[in-house]
């Protein structure tokens, strides 16, 4: 089937699920490893094709509302799941264009030994930009599959000097393999080994504290047990415990990823009856009479009241 016809078929399909959108949006083909059994298009754990389209659609709706406010005219807003995934993968299009023109991608993990073709390879664990990002073993990796840290080596020699000095290997600064950005890209495998010879001696939290204090971009690989029970995440409202009352009890979920300084909760059923009716011209006696006669109900919560949102037990 011709490519153009195939793309039209994909866009007209009404049977999209989240992984289908990841696949059609270019995410799966660019994710994973390039050799061995893991060399298959891989789904991201993030719901790139599900929540993401809804967020993009919200941005479109807000833009349309702003346009209406300025022009007085409404508009239709269209958002496909495929387009939303493509937008988050836009850096991969940049990489494809670079490959079209350069014939190779120096910032990819497989450089310089890869047999380059017409299509960008899978990114493995590289950072998306022109820096050298990689996942390194930390102390305890033999028994903990997530005992790792992610470290970014920025392009500047100053950044490399900070890494070399902090890790106790100033000789790396003058090592010909790492003398500048181009040489570090050409000798990534050796660079990975050097850095990991240091990281493997410390746990991921120690590494994050030590390297972070030196201005090195670093972060621990957190598993979901750590995230669920992280004291800071539970304290600041990133993870919230909601009390649904009744038989449902309490449960944890992810809170809003942003905060508003003047946030107010949604009102309970009937909570604003007096204010609304007063704004329509009803006086207090009339409102009270309507309430007594059952025309309107007294303010009440739902049958399984969410009595509070607890930001930590």
Regions found by a protein language model. Give the residues of each.
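Active-site-adjacent "lid/gating" segments in soluble enzymes
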Residues: 1-147, 162
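A glycine-rich dinucleotide-binding beta-alpha-beta segment and adjacent secondary-structure elements
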Residues: 213-263, 310-313
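Conserved, function-defining micro-sites of small-solute handling proteins
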Residues: 197, 207-215, 220, 256, ...
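Aromatic-enriched alpha-helical interface/lid elements that frame and gate functional surfaces
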Residues: 132-214, 218
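Amphipathic terminal alpha-helices
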Residues: 285, 289-313
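Flexible, acidic loop-helix segments that line cofactor/substrate-binding pockets
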Residues: 75-77, 106, 114, 173-198, ...
């Amino acid at each position: 089937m011709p490519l153009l016809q195939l793309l039209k078929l994909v866009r007209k399909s009404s049977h999209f699920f989240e992984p289908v959108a990841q696949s059609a949006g270019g995410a799966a083909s660019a994710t994973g490893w390039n050799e061995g059994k893991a060399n298959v298009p891989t789904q991201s754990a993030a719901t790139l094709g599900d929540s993401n389209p809804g967020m993009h659609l919200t941005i479109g709706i807000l833009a349309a509302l702003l346009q209406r406010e300025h022009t007085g005219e409404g508009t239709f807003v269209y958002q496909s799941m495929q387009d939303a995934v493509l937008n988050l993968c836009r850096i991969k299009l940049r990489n494809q264009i670079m490959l079209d023109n350069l014939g190779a991608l120096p910032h990819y993990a497989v450089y310089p030994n890869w047999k380059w073709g017409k299509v960008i390879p899978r990114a493995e664990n590289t950072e998306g930009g022109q820096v050298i990002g990689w996942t390194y073993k930390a102390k305890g990796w033999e028994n903990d599959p997530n005992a790792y840290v992610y470290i970014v080596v920025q392009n500047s020699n100053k950044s490399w000097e900070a890494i070399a000095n902090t890790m106790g290997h100033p000789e790396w600064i003058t090592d010909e393999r790492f003398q500048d950005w181009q040489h570090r890209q050409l000798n990534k495998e050796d660079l990975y080994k050097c850095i990991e010879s240091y990281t493997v001696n410390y746990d991921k939290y120690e590494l994050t504290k030590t390297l972070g204090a030196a201005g090195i971009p670093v972060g621990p690989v957190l598993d979901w047990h750590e995230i669920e029970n992280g004291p800071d995440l539970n304290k600041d409202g990133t993870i919230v415990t909601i009390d649904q009352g009744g038989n449902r009890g309490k449960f944890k979920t992810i809170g809003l990823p942003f905060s508003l300084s003047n946030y107010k909760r949604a009102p309970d059923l009937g909570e604003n009856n007096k204010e609304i009716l007063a704004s329509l011209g009803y006086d207090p006696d009339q409102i009270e009479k309507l309430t007594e006669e059952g025309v309107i109900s007294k303010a009440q919560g739902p049958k399984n009241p969410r009595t509070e949102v607890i930001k930590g037990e």
